[in-house]
Every structure is written in structure tokens, then in C-alpha cells.
């Protein structure tokens, strides 16, 4: 009995030590994002993509303004990787299934899969984001807009959802709102070249509309 108790105690100690070790790894990677050596910053951003959590989005968002191109790219990819982790093996499996359905252009099944994900884990922002994308592709702009609202409630750093608003409001010819969200997206991620181009187009459309009203 004593031996069993000793083994169980050792297992509990190992389990308790594992969590702080991962936390330390995250903290070290976050600190390394401010290192003078760009190579270390790049690796730190990649590492956070592997082990980071939503709590690391603030430092990764700051790294989107790093002077090094690769560090910025790695930080952006790290954020997407963190967003794609739900914390539930069942939901992660469904998420992968939904991604495959999106890739195959199966909008109806994709919407059904992400709706199931949302029902199982409503706090998982990326489930809402992917369904918003599918609704947009299906032409249901109002539902897409509503899902984007749910994304940013849960993840205010989600420049992808903010970019989605731009596309939706542009389709609705609400150019002022589209420009508002384009600027918000760039405030978080200044590397969104497509959004910058959208701003140029939207400003032109806005001017043309004003001229027609004169």
C-alpha cells in the first residue's frame, strides 16, 4: 500500500511540474520576442505558435510591428495557430473536418459542421469565424455579419474577422463601415496588404458616390 501511495504521489508531483514547465516555456518565448537578435525573435514567435495560448496574443500582436519581416510573418502565423486550438480533442477533430469541407467547397456541410462546433464549444472564436466565412461564400451576408460579431466578442485581436467585416460591408455598399473596419484591422495587423488595397478602392467608391450626390 505504501508503495502504491508513493507511486501515486510521484505521479502527482510530475503532473504538477509539467504545467509550470510549459508556462515557463511560454514566458521565455514571450520574453524572447524582444531580443536584439532577429533570429531569436523569429524562433520565439514560432514557438508560441506551438505552445501559446490566447493569453499570448498581446505580445504576438506587438510582434506584428517587428522590424524583421520573418518575425512579423511568424507572429501572424502563430496567432492563427493559437486561434485554431479549441482545447477539446473532439472539437479539434470536427474543426479539421470542417476545414476539409471548406476546401472542397461543400458550404452546406461546412456550415453544419461549424454549427455543431459552436454548439459544443461556444467560446471557441474560430468556430464562429469559419462559419462566418462560409456564410459569406454562400451569400448570406447578414448571418456572416452576426458571426463576425461573435468572433470579436471572444477575440478582439482577430484581424481576420475584422477583414471579413470589410468584405461584407463593401458588398452591402456601406463604404463608411467597411473603411472603419479596414482601419481597425490594420491597427492590429499593419501587414495586411490586401486590406490596404481595399482602403484605396473603398475611398475611390466613396468619392464617386459623393460626386453623384452633388
Model-based region annotation:
Residues 97-100, 179-214:
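Terminal, low-structured helical/coil segments at or just beyond the last alpha-helical repeat
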Residues 51, 66, 120, 154-155, ...:
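Structural marker of alpha-solenoid helical repeat scaffolds
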Residues 21-32, 53-64, 88-95:
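Amphipathic alpha-helical scaffolding segments comprising HEAT/armadillo-like alpha-solenoid repeats
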Amino acid at each position: 500500500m505504501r508503495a502504491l501511495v508513493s507511486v501515486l504521489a510521484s505521479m502527482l508531483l510530475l503532473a504538477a511540474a509539467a504545467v509550470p514547465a510549459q508556462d515557463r516555456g511560454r514566458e521565455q518565448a514571450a520574453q524572447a520576442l524582444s531580443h536584439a537578435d532577429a533570429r531569436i525573435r523569429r524562433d520565439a514567435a514560432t514557438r508560441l505558435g506551438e505552445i501559446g495560448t490566447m493569453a499570448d496574443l498581446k505580445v504576438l500582436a506587438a510582434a506584428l510591428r517587428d522590424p524583421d519581416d520573418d518575425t512579423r510573418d511568424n507572429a501572424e502565423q502563430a496567432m492563427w495557430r493559437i486561434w485554431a486550438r479549441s482545447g477539446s480533442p473532439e472539437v479539434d477533430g470536427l474543426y479539421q473536418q470542417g476545414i476539409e469541407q471548406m476546401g472542397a467547397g461543400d458550404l452546406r456541410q461546412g456550415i453544419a459542421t461549424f454549427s455543431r462546433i459552436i454548439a459544443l464549444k461556444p467560446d471557441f472564436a474560430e468556430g464562429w469565424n469559419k462559419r462566418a466565412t462560409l456564410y459569406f461564400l454562400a451569400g448570406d451576408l447578414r448571418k456572416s455579419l452576426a458571426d463576425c460579431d461573435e468572433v470579436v466578442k471572444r477575440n478582439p485581436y482577430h484581424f481576420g474577422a475584422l477583414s471579413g467585416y470589410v468584405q461584407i460591408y463593401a458588398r452591402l455598399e456601406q463604404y463608411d463601415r467597411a473603411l472603419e473596419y479596414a482601419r481597425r484591422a490594420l491597427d492590429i495587423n499593419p501587414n495586411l496588404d490586401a486590406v490596404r488595397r481595399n482602403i484605396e478602392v473603398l475611398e475611390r467608391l466613396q468619392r464617386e458616390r459623393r460626386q453623384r450626390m452633388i
